[in-house]
């Protein structure tokens, strides 16, 4: 029974962390950088959160498309 309690507790922690990352991803990014230095290197390359990257810089203006 103790193993089931640990699994349920871990699932709850994962759910809480994912919701925090969705709604408060800027604040959790700072916390993650403090906890995991490896993710700091990844976030510099914008691999962790690709939606923060402005894709419009690499593409021509929308007026060129039909």
Curated annotation (Swiss-Prot):
Taxonomic superkingdom: Eukaryota
Protein's recorded name: ATP synthase F(0) complex subunit 8
Main subcellular location: mitochondrion
Family: Belongs to the ATPase protein 8 family.
Modified residues (N6-acetyllysine): 54, 57
Job of this protein: Subunit 8, of the mitochondrial membrane ATP synthase complex (F(1)F(0) ATP synthase or Complex V) that produces ATP from ADP in the presence of a proton gradient across the membrane which is generated by electron transport complexes of the respiratory chain. ATP synthase complex consist of a soluble F(1) head domain - the catalytic core - and a membrane F(1) domain - the membrane proton channel. These two domains are linked by a central stalk rotating inside the F(1) region and a stationary peripheral stalk.
Gene: MT-ATP8
Recorded GO CC terms: mitochondrial membrane; proton-transporting ATP synthase complex
Quaternary structure note: Component of the ATP synthase complex composed at least of ATP5F1A/subunit alpha, ATP5F1B/subunit beta, ATP5MC1/subunit c (homooctomer), MT-ATP6/subunit a, MT-ATP8/subunit 8, ATP5ME/subunit e, ATP5MF/subunit f, ATP5MG/subunit g, ATP5MK/subunit k, ATP5MJ/subunit j, ATP5F1C/subunit gamma, ATP5F1D/subunit delta, ATP5F1E/subunit epsilon, ATP5PF/subunit F6, ATP5PB/subunit b, ATP5PD/subunit d, ATP5PO/subunit OSCP.
Swiss-Prot/TrEMBL keywords: Acetylation, ATP synthesis, CF(0), Hydrogen ion transport, Ion transport, Membrane, Mitochondrion, Transmembrane, Transmembrane helix, Transport
Entry membrane topology: Single-pass membrane protein
UniProt modified residues of type N6-succinyllysine: 54
Localisation: Mitochondrion membrane
Record-level GO BP terms: ATP biosynthetic process; proton transmembrane transport
Transmembrane portions of the chain: 8-24
